[in-house]
């Protein structure tokens, strides 16, 4: 389900703008100013990047998406995988008070309560206790082992804030005259729990993070005004190919996550699962992406990518291995025609898609495929009353449980399957890997049978990266930490 780590769609030149080798790094994130500076726990991609830069959690992610120390300088995991014990770095809060295990316990417990009602709370449901063991040692206990628990703890939403401030590694200031701009500078090494370093300011660069529309960001990059553009999606991908990008390159993350159409209501044409399946059967998924020229993008017909199971035979590549596309479409035609004959209504489906030229291309391709089976497609105006809504979301960790949690009925996003939720809930306390795998497979089967979602493939995330930018790496999580961009590479 993952495509090539660095997909070069514009040519890379050896000569870089020398002015970009020093001075502030200018970064544009495709986001709104309001979303960029959002507080709380429901963060846009831009806000995630800003939170990760200014408010660390126990651990963090490096440019390649690997877990690294943050407030916790080291940790151990017990042999049974049920206890994670962290030793905190010898450091202070911005007001000068020492960081203690009691502080972290309170902040983590508060954050877990704040997350209630979100999919991230479901991901964190294995946490049974947060204990302060000594002044700088804290323990998190789990209901059953979770190999990627540290990656989950590194999510920006788990960055810890006390009295309105985090512990860095960067500090933010804002310009009164520019509500879309955040200026970020590194904290001194000793305030980050590291040895003091003489003249450290001479080696660290400052960073300006600006929220922009996709078109504005691409134009600014082409004009040499920004060094890096983040948070490009399929909806905006055609904009990245506008104009000569001779001073940089497009990089596409090998993203893991959900990209498909969520069924909003069981009404009309979509009232029966067999007709929802008919729409899924009729799609030429590889053809949907062809207009974008994204080589290596792997379509999928499943909610949980088959590659996440240790045994590929547990989830074959195709849902309909004995049927080719033409055969599937003939079945879809019959099901749609039977409904039209029974009701006398026209088969029409409305889709809510984000703004952008990529959405127009995607809609056109879907309309072509469904038109072949007798279904007319409309774009929902303002998203109101849509039959289907695009779900475009990056995974936080590579387990079937993340995918299953995205359709939990408590989230009230669209159609769901209560029996799937119950199976995932049962798996929270199961220690045996084979039994847990069985529960996940049954939960996935329940969601598939309910036809709550029409999967298309992995999400698309692209960036524009100038050659002088260091410490940037495409990764499957789509998070690109800002702090390493400002640090010397030697």
Give names to the regions the model predicted.
Residues 29-79, 109:
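N-terminal lobe/hinge region of extracytoplasmic solute-binding protein
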Residues 266, 270-310, 362, 447-452:
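Periplasmic-binding protein-like
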Residues 17, 379, 402-467:
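Extracytoplasmic/peripheral linker and loop segments enriched in polar/acidic and small residues
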Residues 144-207, 213-216:
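Gly/Pro-rich hinge or "lid" segments in bacterial periplasmic/extracellular proteins
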Residues 298-339, 356-360:
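Structural transition elements
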Residues 74-117, 269-271:
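Aromatic- and charge-enriched surface segment that lines or borders ligand/interaction sites
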Residues 465-490:
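Long beta-strand-rich cores associated with HINT superfamily self-processing modules
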Residues 177-185, 193-195, 208-266, 392:
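Extracellular/periplasmic solute-recognition and catalytic clefts
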């Amino acid at each position: 389900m993952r495509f090539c780590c660095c997909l070069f769609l514009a040519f890379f030149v050896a000569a870089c703008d020398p002015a970009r080798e020093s001075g502030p790094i200018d970064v544009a994130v495709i986001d709104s100013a309001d979303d960029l500076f959002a507080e709380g726990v429901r963060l846009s991609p831009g806000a995630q990047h800003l939170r990760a830069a200014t408010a660390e959690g126990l651990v963090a992610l490096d440019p390649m998406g690997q877990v690294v120390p943050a407030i916790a300088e080291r940790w151990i995991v017990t042999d049974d995988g049920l206890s994670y014990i962290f030793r905190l770095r010898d450091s202070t809060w911005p007001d000068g008070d020492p960081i203690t295990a009691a502080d972290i316990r309170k902040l983590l417990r508060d954050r877990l309560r704040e997350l209630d009602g979100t999919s991230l709370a479901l991901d964190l449901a294995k946490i049974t206790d947060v204990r302060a063991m000594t002044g700088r040692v804290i323990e998190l206990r789990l209901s059953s082992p979770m190999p990627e628990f540290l990656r989950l703890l590194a999510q920006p939403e788990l960055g810890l804030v006390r009295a309105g401030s985090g512990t860095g590694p960067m500090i933010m200031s804002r310009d009164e005259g520019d509500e879309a701009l955040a200026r970020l500078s590194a904290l001194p090494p000793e305030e980050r729990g590291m040895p003091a370093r003489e003249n450290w300011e001479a080696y660290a660069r400052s960073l300006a993070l600006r929220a922009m529309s996709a078109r504005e960001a691409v134009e600014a990059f082409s004009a040499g005004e920004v060094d890096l553009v983040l948070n490009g999606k399929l909806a905006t991908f055609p904009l990245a190919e506008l104009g000569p990008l001779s001073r940089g390159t497009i990089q596409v993350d090998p993203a893991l996550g959900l990209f498909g159409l969520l069924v909003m209501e069981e009404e009309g044409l979509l009232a029966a699962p067999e007709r929802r399946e008919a729409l899924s059967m009729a799609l030429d998924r590889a053809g949907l992406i062809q207009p974008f020229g994204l080589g290596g993008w792997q379509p999928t017909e499943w909610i949980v990518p088959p590659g996440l199971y240790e045994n590929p035979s547990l989830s074959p590549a195709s849902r309909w291995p004995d049927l080719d596309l033409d055969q599937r479409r003939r079945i879809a035609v019959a099901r749609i025609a039977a409904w039209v004959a029974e009701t006398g209504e026209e088969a029409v489906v409305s889709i809510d898609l984000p703004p952008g030229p990529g959405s127009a291309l995607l809609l056109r391709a879907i309309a072509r495929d469904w038109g072949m089976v007798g279904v007319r497609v409309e774009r929902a105006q303002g998203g109101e009353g849509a039959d289907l809504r695009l779900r475009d979301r990056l995974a936080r960790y590579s387990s079937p449980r993340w995918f299953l949690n995205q359709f939990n009925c408590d989230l009230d996003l669209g159609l769901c399957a209560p029996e799937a939720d119950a199976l995932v809930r049962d798996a929270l306390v199961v220690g045996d890997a084979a039994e847990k795998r069985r529960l996940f497979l049954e939960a996935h089967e329940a969601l598939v049978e309910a036809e709550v979602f029409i999967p298309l493939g992995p999400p698309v995330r692209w960036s524009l990266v100038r050659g002088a930018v260091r410490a940037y790496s495409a990764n499957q999580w789509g998070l690109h930490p800002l702090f390493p961009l400002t640090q010397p590479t030697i």
